[in-house]
Each structure stands twice: as structure tokens, then as C-alpha cells.
Amino acid sequence: MRKAAAAGIILAGIILVAGGLDRKGGSDNFVADVQANDETTQEEDENISSEETTLAAQIDTSAQVTAGSRIAVVSKATDGEYWKLVRRGMEDAVKDINTAYDFSSDDAVTMTFEGPSDEQDVETQINTLDAVIAENPTVLCMSAGDIESCQAQLEAASENGIPVVVFDSNVSDDELVAAFRGTDNTYAGKLAAEKLVDAIGESGKIAVFSAQEKTESSQKRVEGFKEALAD
């Protein structure tokens, strides 16, 4: 769970420079937390705490950050330990950035964190996106509860010159996304299938249950899982 907080910290840094990214989106601006390797090393896990505590010292203040920038985060959910850690990590990162750039009062970078309490409540997330976009934030950051349902909101953000950073669960039209921060979910699904096969052998009946069939992350994990079993 510490990785969730670390991801939030890194994400906040990405958001603040999103204005300098290619707003047409594309794979060049997409970052995965889990890459196609066989295992995460113990050394990587041990480095997470130090990454969390040394961000302020690592911030390159030569990068242009507009004073008074407003980051609007619309999460897939706000309840649950994972989302609370993501929020805490992002809030800590904003504090570190304000310290590094000596921003205060009206110059300070600010962040709001909103969304439904339940990840399944897509309607509330869409309504929240509408309200947030109407406030014209500097950057919109979101984790999509439904891969397709927020297309109109993404188009509205683009029309109003609001760069969009997506984290955790992506959207179908990545041309409207400036950057993505998340897991290689296809690989994660393949890894889960490989571990299961190691445990049960090469034959048997397997049932796959997906808690969130409309999210990109769940779809990719199931896809990767099935691909690994078919190989």
C-alpha cells in the first residue's frame, strides 16, 4: 500500500508539468508502474519510503510551474485505504512543490480531491467531472470508473484548454489525455495467471470474476489473464 502513496506523489509532479506535454496525448506520455519483468525486487520496495521523504529535495525548480495553479482531481472513489493513500501522497507532493518553489498565499499551488465514495458509482463521477470542468482548473486529473462514459467530459476539457492526466484506470480515447500514470494491467493479469498455473498445475477449471468490468484496468487484467492461459 505504500506504493499507492508514492504513486500519488509522483503523479502530482506529472500533473504540474502537464502543460508542457503534448496535449494530443499518445503513448510517449504514458507511464506504467508494473513493467514486463518477472518480479519486483526487494530493493525497489525498500526505496519507496526514501522516495516519499526526499521528493522536495529532488524537485527541479528550473521546470516552469505557474504560480497559483489549481489541480482538480476526480478520483474513481474517495473511500478505501488505497484512495486515501493516493490522496495523501498527492497532498504531500503539493506541499513539497510549494516549498521548493517558495509559493505561498495566492501563489500557492492548490489541489482539490473529489469523487464518489463507491467505485461503482459512475454517475456521480460524471456529475463531479462536469462541475469541476466548469470551474476551469489548470489541470484535471482523473481515474475513470468507466472506460467509455466520460468521453463528453474529456472533449469539454480539451475544448477549454484543460490538460487531462489520467491515473490508475485509463479511458478509451487517449488522444484526449496528456499523460497516464498506472500499471501495465495486461502484464499484471498474465502474471496472475502464471502464478495460478504454478499452483494448480496445467489442467483444471478456472472461474474469473471481475469486480469492475467497465474499467480499463479490470478489462486489461482479464485480457492478460486469458492470454496467458491460452499460451
Question: Residue locations for each model-derived region?
Answer:
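A residue-level marker of the well-folded mature domains of exported/periplasmic proteins
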Residues: 2-231
